[in-house]
Amino acid sequence: VSQAVLQACFLSKMRKIISLVLLLAFSQQPSLACDGTARQSSGDAREWWQSAQFYQIYPRSFMDSNGDGIGDLAGITSRLNYLKDLNVTAVWLSPIYTSPMADFGYDIADFFDIQPEYGTLNDFDNLVQEANKLGLKVILDFVPNHSSDENEWFKKSVRRERGYEDYYVWHDGYKNESGARVPPSNWLQAFRGSAWEWNEERQQYYLHQFAVKQPDLNYRTPAVVAQMKRVLTYWLDRGVAGFRVDAVPWCFEVLPDETGRYPDEPLSGYTDDPDDSSYLLHIYTQDLPETVDMVYQWRKLLDDYQRIHGGDRRVLLTEAWSPLDYVMKFYGNRTTEGAQMPFNFQFIVGGNSDKNNTDLPASGFVKIISSWLDNMPSGHTANWVMGNHDQRRVGSRYGEGRIDLMNMLQMFLPGVSITYMGEEIGMTDLDISWEDSRDPAACNSNANIYEQFTRDPARTPFQWSNTANAGFSTNSTTWLPINPNYVTVNVQTEEAASKSHLTIYNQLVALRKTKTLQQGDASYTAIGDNVLAIKRFLKDEKTYLLLANVLDSAVTADVSDVLRVSGNFNTIITNMLSTRKEGDIVSVNNVPLGAYEAIIVESQ
């Protein structure tokens, strides 16, 4: 629900505070120059995903092929050439399964079929086939924590049918002193309110850590574990190259005590709102050790499948808005492989806040980078997630002047890049009115506070052109309003421009293919408050520098000593705010940078 299900709306603000505390604890304190180095084992055989470009599509908002105002699979297929031109390696699709859409696909009624408004299984098979022809891989969202209450499994569990009695987490609850029925514990759901809901037919409460219509599956029941592994195998058989696992931390809860009672979670002290998820510390419902083991089991299933069926390695990407020490466990341990890519959300939870980092100094950027690279287990690959369908868009969170810089960072740093659709053209948030809101995280609140929780602003339809509805749909209306800035911020206009966010993104794509960026090491530093400097280097290959003024005041910097470089470099990529031209000479001991200017230069 995720990428994050999450978060702040549901991802409790509390979890982000914890992550930020850990981020600061793990990082160096700011100084004139905050340094870090990341080394890659270029001598080892590298797999396809280790320097891949992943591209997240929110299907409802990407491309509408049939004019109903909602994006669909055929629409995605029709735009595959655009993704190929972006040099995308793998396309990750947010949920497309059969769903009543209480949480836009994260409430799954049938894990083995396609939501009709998105298309059919034939449409999906065609998408995979056409993508593979272009050299693109398809990754699916895997939503293991819960199903829809309209799923047949839940209906059978309600009826206590044999084999399904404990598919979900059920409890009788209690009677208080006045005789009124009360839930089994004080646990809260991500979308506000109790995590327990009374079911009249079964005469018990069921656990739902997300919406009422999203009952939690019971992973302490072996049949559930086996069933969800069948789900993975089914889609592997249909040609998917891997899975992004949604809302991982919630899969297991503590067992009840010997009397059958679940423990109440302690108060967090972060808010006085008793319905807000961050009102409690979720020590009994999230981040349990059993969840890590479950991820290891899923990785083993993927590896076993690859050994039997051949082909490229299938990949596992996990979403966990958890403390860093817990997230790092998903990589694996000395004896067991875990996810290839536990998502790195440090550019989202780090900095000043998850909502506004427009004045983050260079030392803040270095801390964010270091927090992952310094704590990642050796022998593993980093990944960089700047945004997703649950977060404010990068340009709205870091500032429009930093759009190109954030794309530069994502492409320039060592490891895997993961782009949320629209970031390559600089799409920004659209404020959605209470009346137009569709996100349950917002709709479960009220008109006075919904903006604290809504994820709709980053989910507006993709902007293809300056024609009606941004070229997304022929319908007179779309499921969410389209950002009026589509007139200038769109693929067609930016492709035709001599310089745009998209042309810069494509330059970064080309640079990323160089051996230095594929295999080279990295060093990074902050010079004062303004300048972020990153070096990528590899023996016998060109050296590249990313030099960025992250603030709104001009500055001149000497990067020669801190990056251990000398002489002149040639300018090869500049952001929209730079007045430099390609080929301009840059002397590393005297680099003037305008407000928010970012450049990439190469050794002569």
Give names to the regions the model predicted:
Residues 1-22:
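Classical eukaryotic N-terminal signal peptides for Sec-dependent ER targeting/secretion
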Residues 25, 30-233, 237, 250-324, ...:
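Acidic/aromatic-lined carbohydrate-recognition and catalytic surfaces
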Residues 45, 49, 256, 260-284, ...:
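Loop/helix patches that line or flank the sugar-binding groove of alpha-linked glycan CAZymes
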Residues 91, 243-245:
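Hydrophobic residues within beta-strands of alpha/beta enzymes
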Residues 554-578:
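Beta-strand-rich binding/interaction modules
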